[in-house]
Amino acid sequence: MTLYCSFALERETFLAETNLKAPEIWVGKIFLAGHTVDHKKDTSEILRLIQTLVEDTVAKDYSKLSDQVSPKEGLLLDLKGIWTREEIKKELSKKGNYFETYFFDRELLKKQKNSENVRTVRDLFLLSGGIEIEFYYESMTECELKFRFKENTEWEKELINPYFKKVQGKWYLHRMF
């Protein structure tokens, strides 16, 4: 029991640090549904976007998030619906906002869920040991990602698969993890 408490305390201390590096991210399997277009450029662009999102999550900084969202399509957030760039900026300006609660701050999430047994998206990334990204191209303009953790694989299911759409030749985040 003492060993478990000691490990849990060490993990809590580690996750509370603010100068942590984002986990390594690499391309895994790539699936093409109904088309055979060369996806290398698209895969590189989406990988760069997801690396930035993971780095920003670990850094607790979504100040650039709205720039990664299509002005036309918006961002699908769980049960919150689709948010415009302006709504994202407005939400980020609030203390204790949705992103702080679910993505960054375990204490806020504990209060929200009324439970001690919670993990933020940031926690999941930091405890992943590295992330392999599977790409599921549903068309030439839509791609869903699946995260595969190197460690703590049972926690992968706590994330929603991010979804990207290509609008006017540029890839944008359409659904968060």
List the predicted regions and their residue ranges.
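Bacterial Sec-dependent N-terminal signal peptides
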Residues: M1-R11
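Short, low-complexity N-terminal intrinsically disordered segments enriched in polar/charged residues
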Residues: R11-A59, D67, L75
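Short beta-strand and adjacent turn/loop elements
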Residues: V69-E73, S93, I160
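Short, solvent-exposed secondary-structure junction/capping segments
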Residues: V69-W83
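A solvent-exposed, acidic/Ser-Thr-rich amphipathic alpha-helical stretch
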Residues: G81-K111
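Exposed beta-sheet edge and beta->alpha loop/turn motif
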Residues: D105-F177
